Amino acid sequence: MSVQKRERLLSGGVDPLVRVDLDMIAKDSDDTVKKQMNDFLELFKSYVESEQINWDKIGFLPAEKVVEHSSLAKVEPSKAKELLGKLVVLKLNGGLGTSMGCEGPRSLIYVRDDMTFLDLAVKQIKHLKQKYDADVPLVLMNSFNTHTETEKIKHRYENAVSIYMFEQSRFPRISKESLRPIPKDANSHHSSWYPPGHGDVYRSLLRTGLLKKFIDEGKEYLFISNIDNLGATADLEILDFLVNQKDPPEFIMEVIDRTRSDVRGGTLVNYDGKIRLLEMAQVPKDKVDEFKSVSKFKIFNTNNLWVNLKAIDRLLSKDKIHMEVIVNQKAAPGGSGLIIQLETAAGAAMKNFDRAIGMKVPRSRFLPVKTTSDLLLMMSNLYIVTDNGSLMMNPKRGFTTVPLVKLGDKNFQKVKDFLDRFQNIPNMLELDHLTVSGDVTFGTNITLKGTVIIIANDEERIDIPSGTVLENKIVSGNMRILDH
């Protein structure tokens, strides 16, 4: 935002017009829309009043602010039921599968053994019920993009687990030029709206009444994670650490060692004496390379968050949950100028909570699936599905590093095209690196070892025959297998 535009807003030049626009949107609408427009106005004010991060104020976290998961005490199985009775699990289910060519919710993509992300999430909760006789509520925070489709299949799970779902806020996109809302009323086309990021989870829990319900039922902690993180399961050691400390942290963010593949993700820093999540979008342009340094910023936010429910309620009642505004700029539908989405991240709220800490966990608790390259890894024999519904590295691999997989261009981007190109998933137990580009197909019972690079030239095709073993090979050019 330019200095002149910010000064104009702060002096009241545009803000009254924004308020009028929001009042028009809320006119003749229900209380939910009115509340959401008020919440958006508060977010808009935060955006206007926000100041660029002062890089000189960023420092390293004191050692006591990051606890090693390996230092936690093991939990006796006899204590599990009582501990789990204090827990609510919430999965963030607002995303579509567009990055993998799917139109519906990402959570309904089939991942492994004919199970979707949502099936695996339910399996995790069902396991707790079967093993420990613990009824842990599963809550799904949907967006307006995913709510209807997810609601249609809710009945499949209702006999297995206690499942709740709600639709997070729907906020108006704004014009980058005028900073005024795009929609004219509450019924404007869906392209005029956006879900404002997972930082909306706290206010949405309050608005839906679920926060009060769970507190009244004696629940104490909320475990939040992305539904496409197949390693994010309820962890008894972390829960025990929270419940049985004298002065427990009100907020724990699970972090892992940062690698070069994680450099765009958030990290934890000491800012003005407080623990804070620092995201790439907040970094000054001239400091981006420094931010990407894994030797300087060594930990990475998994977005697995443990939060005290009463603390959420206390802070919301005093309007004390403040989060940095993330500005997401996009081309307007139809290509007519640029629009802005104002978003917040759930992890950014940690600075508001007492005794907030990071907890360094094994990388096995962070198995996200964002692309078909990730999907290939999860579908392969590199991982096995455990009884508790999580994926773990196959013990037969012998070492814990995950292969680097790059499935290039449009031939593999969409799930349907990706599946059409594999008659079955190759044996990848000894794979280190796989790059595939161009028109390439794979037969059955293929084994990939070491570094394998397969590049089909333009207008040519490579068919990898069934039974092939490729170890430290580069395959290029044209290789067709035709029916006789």
Indicate where each model-derived feature is located:
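Left-handed beta-helix
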Residues: M1-G85, D240-H484
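Conserved N-terminal catalytic core of the sugar/cofactor nucleotidyltransferase
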Residues: M1-K91, S99-R106, Y110-Y221, E430, ...
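Active-site-proximal structural scaffolding
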Residues: V89, V111, L118, S143, ...
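Residues immediately flanking
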Residues: N93-G94, I227, L309, T372
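Glycine-centered flexibility sites
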Residues: G94-G97, G101, G197, G266, ...
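Short capping/connector residues at structural and topological boundaries
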Residues: G101, P105, D113-T116, D235, ...
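Conserved short loop/turn motifs at secondary-structure junctions
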Residues: P137-T146, I227-L230, R363-L367, T371
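Conserved core of the sugar-phosphate nucleotidyltransferase
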Residues: T148-K320
